[in-house]
Amino acid sequence: MSLESLTVQTKYGPVRGKRNVSLLGQEYVSFQGIPYARAPEGELRFKAPVPPQKWTETLDCTQQCEPCYHFDRRLQKIVGCEDSLKINVFAKEINPSTPLPVMLYIYGGGFTEGTSGTELYGPDFLVQKDIVLVSFNYRIGALGFLCCQSEQDGVPGNAGLKDQNLAIRWVLENIAAFGGDPKRVTLAGHSAGAASVQYHLISDASKDLFQRRIVMSGSTYSSWSLTRQRNWVEKLAKAIGWDGQGGESGALRFLRRAKPEDIVAHQEKLLTDQDMQDDIFTPFGPTVEPYLTEQCIIPKAPFEMARTAWGDKIDIMIGGTSEEGLLLLQKIKLHPELLSHPHLFLGNVPPNLKISMEKRIEFAAKLKQRYYPDSIPSMENNLGYVHMMSDRVFWHGLHRTILARAARSRARTFVYRICLDSEFYNHYRIMMIDPKLRGTAHADELSYLFSNFTQQVPGKETFEYRGLQTLVDVFSAFVINGDPNCGMTAKGGVVFEPNAQTKPTFKCLNIANDGVAFVDYPDADRLDMWDAMYVNDELF
């Protein structure tokens, strides 16, 4: 394949990609770092993205681009640049006989970190299939989610979500040139990326831009997916050295001149103990925008938006891992005293519930009885805490999404649960939490969908390899056909059915070390307990 044959003409100008061989021996082509927006620098910092200017000379897109600014916890340093609103395209070939369906992936990271780079999201496994895989960078932290209240400042927030919206539109306008079908786009995301997918499903700004969605371990029903405004702009500016003159507009002017590294270094230090008790996960994340604009993503409470969501008409595959809550042990390892805090259970009753303190205390007692009936929490006895965090932080939000779909949608909802527990291949648990722990942590499933910096491929006779091929097969089948039933489910003698809309208990495809099974969700009774905390129509 010549270099000329790897040159593609986009709406904005020609780009050159390269030919690769995957870790599994599959030839594929890649285009990395294609601009989909102008660099959000100077006066464009914090604002909604602007489409790129056109170019005439062929742009070299054979190398990975820098990520958006963030603190990389794996590398323990601030990385990135501002000129990073770039998109990546991977496929077996760019001239297929018929256009291929597209999987457009949004990375997670709590809206504060993350990258589309191949060190975490390599295409080696998914390019086995007849799909086009697309990933992209979007702004995170304060640079992506700073919100000013005055319309005059022109920074209503959610710039990171608006980056995503522009990237989706770029795909519709350009993916045909790469062999993709703009009429068969599946929007997929993990964690904060999954919540982002749901924001686009409930926002009219993204209406009808894609045909299916995959939601992995994240939901707009989870409290961490929405930030409340508490004068964060001025607090951030003061932390960096602003003199306090000019109010919020003065703070914005100061922050536009500040070094991005200083913004990243100070943004997460703003949260107080009270903020965290009030369930504020980050100062800078998705927020209800203070006024309407043409690009507005969240005009009102997401809970209300979801009730008339355009996305209820399209199919969804949704799920998570069996021990999502292992993620929260990172904080407990640093602050083990939290497990013995007298308000451990009371503090995990959702603070936004409109109930009396007496009722809160009653629910706290139920949490204690359910997760620690005959013992007390400790680092040595952390399984109850892991289960409580799995349910509260991740699975209950997913459950509320599933219930809302059952009540309001006629489209299909497929639910999966991943419990692949490997001693060496659950990379997130091993490298970021604790290699001595067992279970399938939040983000562990990503190693079975995407290649990463470890360059590991399990042996073909292992359950890890079978799990990898199962996830790739199920996900790509949904992208291609809208039906996740595939060779790996058939091999296991399983039919992966959509959830019935009349049954309160949902079923899921359970992907485990010993194979696949279609079962009642194993921990449904725990989720029912969380459901009971909500009254009337507050659940969904």
From Swiss-Prot:
EC number(s) reported in the record: 3.1.1.1
Glycosylated residue positions: N452
Name listed for the protein in its UniProt record: Esterase B1
Chemical reaction(s) catalysed: a carboxylic ester + H2O = an alcohol + a carboxylate + H(+)
Gene for this chain: B1
Disulphide bond pairs: C68-C81
Residues forming the catalytic site: S191 (acyl-ester intermediate), E324 (charge relay system), H442 (charge relay system)
Keywords carried by this UniProt record: Disulfide bond, Glycoprotein, Hydrolase, Serine esterase, Signal
Record InterPro entries: AB_hydrolase_fold, CarbesteraseB, Carboxylesterase_B_AS
GO terms of molecular function: carboxylesterase activity
Keyword Zinc: no
Top-level taxon: Eukaryota
Family statement: Belongs to the type-B carboxylesterase/lipase family.
Function recorded in the entry: Overproduction of nonspecific esterases is a common mechanism of resistance to organophosphate insecticides.
Miscellaneous comment text of the record: There are two such esterases: A and B. Alleles of both A and B are known.
Hydrolase as UniProt keyword: yes
Listed Pfam families: COesterase
